[in-house]
Amino acid sequence: MKTNNLFYFMKLSLSLSYGVCMFLLMSSCVEQKKTAIEQSLKKNDYYVAAYVWPSCHDDRPLGHEMLWADGIGEWEVIKKGNPRFEGHYQPKQPLWGYELDNDPEVVGKWIDVATDHGVNVFIYDWYWYDEKPYLESALNDGFLKAKNNEKMQFYVMWANHDVKKNYWNYHKYGDDTSILWDAKVDWENYKIIVERVIRQYFHKPNYFKIDGNPVFAIFSIEKLKQSFNNSDEDTRKALDYFRDEVKKAGFPDLHLQLIFGGGYFLSEQSGKNITTSIEKMGFNSVTFYNMGGRVEDYIVYGTNSINIREQWDKLLNLPFFPCVSVGWDDTPRFPAYGMKDVVHYNNTPESFATLLSKAKIFADNHPEQPKLITINAWNEWVEGSYLLPDMKYGFGYLEAVKDVIIDGKYDR
């Protein structure tokens, strides 16, 4: 009997030991995964955020019915790009082929290559037209269903701009510049938008936050004001409503970021008007979608952008985050455009790396704010500004980000 008891206790002890070991092993794996993610983000202290233009999938009903009937989204237009001058690289050809941006396996590949090269935030362009979401599948089905999405932080930019009929597909609409979709919203739709983004995105553990506050970016200050009687005060009330709903959802506050479509120099008076309006409406930070002021020479383009950045930084009484563009070539959208409309001289990964290093210095010189740098863009194929590998430079632009952000090759 004693022998049986002894055997029983030995068996029990072994089982318990095994169970404890397995628990510790699993806990260790979870902690290692969590630590790996944290180390990936803390490796350099920089938040390198690339804009994602989510047009390359079969969006239904709006995209399919009104713009791209082939079932591949804007690839339909990108493939039709044609050279306008000698040496003009058109059509743009992705190294990985014409993959759909709402495929979680595709986006999973994006996430791996982005984080390996120093890009750790995606800013998804997000739309609301005709009382419904537009192009949302890229984020909902592509990014959020990618098995490794926790490696990458993300936030949403409400791209609240109008769309002319021939802007996104002149092959279909020709010279018809009438408005296809007006981005202005009424209070009812605005409340739906607020509820939707809080519910769908803000509670995700990898949603990008500043001081614990979810970051929500807005593209057009003009269309925002048009939605609320063209009044700074009424717009402030709408944004305060958003803040209140975010607080009810359990967050300390909302970080509202205003994004201007492109950088440009301001006169003294226009600078005062913009800064006064921004402050009245209660925005928390400002950045650009692209560098703006495009010229043929990328070095001149970049030098202008640095001067514009310095002016805006001095004018604003709130954080301004630097933006670096990969390039610019939107000729696939505009048949009349030619050489003078394309950034093509000195438009190389090395030139981009130099400009990105200047943005890094700017971030270092502003220790009072997060080291956030925005990049135009991750996949703006139709505008010729993308980090994703192509048939011309391969992984050149991603390697440039790694050289600057992770390896510090451009540090002085």
Regions flagged by a language model, labelled:
Residues 27-28:
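C-terminal motif of bacterial Sec signal peptides marking the signal peptidase cleavage site
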